[in-house]
Amino acid sequence: MAFVSIAPLASRCCVHKSFVSSREVKPLCRTIPTLGRCRRGKTVTPSISMCWTATVLDDGVQRRIANHHSNLWDDSFIQSLSTPYGETSYLERADKLIGEVKEIINSISVEDGELITPLNDLIQRLSIVDIIERLGIDRHFKNEIKSALDYVYSYWNEKGIGCGRECVITHLNSTALGLRTLRLHGYPVSSDVLEQFKDQNGQFACSAIQTEGEIKSVLNLFRASLIAFPGEKVMEEAEIFSTIYLKEALLTIPVCSLSREIAYVLEHGWHTNLPRLEARNYIDVFGQDPIYGTPNIKMTQKLLEIAKLEFNIFHSLQQKELKHLSRWWKDSVFSQLAFPRHRHVEYYTLASCIDIDPQHSSFRLGFAKISHLGTVLDDIYDTFGTMDELELFTAAVKRWHPSATKWLPEYMKGVYMMLYETVNEMAREADKSQGRDTLNYARQAWEAYIDSYMKEAKWISSGFLPTFEEYLDNGKVSFGYRIGTLQPILTLGTPFPHHILQEIDFPSSLNDLACSILRLKGDILTYQAERSRGEKSSCISCYMKDNPGSTEEDAVAYINGMVNKSLKELNWEFLRPDSNAPITSKKHAFDILRAFYHLYKHRDGFSVARNEIRNLVKTTVIEPVPL
């Protein structure tokens, strides 16, 4: 998980002034042994702006605490949320419209001679699939989507496709959209089809005057280029060309559905795109221009109404799940701890942005709970705990029994029991889906996670700077991607035999690449803040140690190159046609990476969850779509 802390602390022994009263403040700020706790119902809220160094009087323990802001989503606010969209009438209306759209889609197989002809039947099928997927309603049309793509693929050749099956000339828009869509659905298609759209100089060409049709073609070229596999130079060239083209187009075209779509795609791409956020955006895009993207205005209007209804119906389920999660947090020890980040609502938002299936409540809630646990443990190991306490907690996790709490300090006892109970509860839920005991999988993942934190704590304590390779090997585990992925996906209701799980979980290439990408990307955005509080180890500093004379800029450039290369390798591991694990089995693991990567577009979105992430919560969880 995104457990990297970025709070700028001056020293290892820093405790917030909220823990002390004015009469107790002396040089070095001596205070009472609160251990970061307060009475039930009274949370000590750290300030955003300052952090004081303090010493606990009774035992002389020196602690530091990051200046993380408090929980932004009060339980009373969450419990007050209400919506009418869980009523049966909305469900019935959505089901009726879904049936009507299926009839329209199935009728496309019979050309009407006007809208659907042998000269445009391929692009029309692709466009309909694309619209359905971007509106977030594709789970209702799986058979129709497969039928449409099978039809398109039957006419695919080494040069791509034209707009229709009887077109003798291939078309950039049809070929680019086809390449992207077919590849994402597991069809073996080569990027070599794009070579024919270069000029005699080997460059992608465009006309002197930008037309709407050309802009749409280049937009789909950009979208296709993001689904690149290793070694596909033409995809790299396509991405560079289309990025420049689209940025220039935004400066010249008026504000409209097309400009809004371009801006969204350039901002979120594919690896940082979240399906529910995308659906919310395209509801507005198609609402602004009902004929945008398809000639069948009747079908587009129905699809738009389905998307709005589905968004709001799921919104009613989100409220129920969020209320459960907020009560879980409020009634736990977490709400009494002042030092850690409280991001349970933000984690739930991520889960509900990548999985909107009503049957997957266990996945969404489990992901939020497990991720929040990981964040609290990160703040304990990274800042608050002493080395002796961390050794005790590490041993307790390996013992995995409630009796292990008797050796722990008071504030750790509650955290340990929440970890123990939550992991066991999720294991019982996963056992129902998998038909076998899954607790050992979870325990192994948590032990590895805690061990990686213990190693980092020792590095900080001793001032040791590891090699780049040693740091990354440990950092891939300490990021927490594995613990955030393993148990939640085992609750989905899909059986994961051992050989399938091995291609998703550790030590699979998919898991290793995801962990590497997130650790490297996280460090690029947080190393300066970590260095300011005395933490030497980061991929930046370790690279510079291994390469004397290199600068921070050199290190960042090298690591960005590693990330970009790894993203292409991850695309291949996710979509490769020869994999034993089907794409559907790997999708949640891949989407969890996209959720975390979304937070690291510009900065650590969890340590400071006030801007983009707060807006994400509001637009995808709190606020319904106007019908």
Swiss-Prot record:
Mg(2+) 3 binds at residue 530. Pathway: Terpene metabolism; oleoresin biosynthesis. It catalyses: (2E)-geranyl diphosphate + H2O = (R)-linalool + diphosphate. Binds 3 Mg(2+) or Mn(2+) ions per subunit. Its EC number is 4.2.3.26. It comes from the Eukaryota. Residues 1-21 form a transit peptide. Keywords: Chloroplast, Lyase, Magnesium, Metal-binding, Plastid, Transit peptide. CDD domains: Terpene_cyclase_plant_C1. Its cofactor is Mg(2+); Mn(2+). GO terms for cellular component: chloroplast. Mg(2+) 1 binds at residues 378, 382. A motif (DDXXD motif) lies at residues 378-382. One of its GO terms (molecular function) is lyase activity. It holds the Pfam family Terpene_synth_C. Belongs to the terpene synthase family. Tpsd subfamily. This is (R)-linalool synthase, chloroplastic. It comes from Picea glauca. The gene is TPS-Lin.
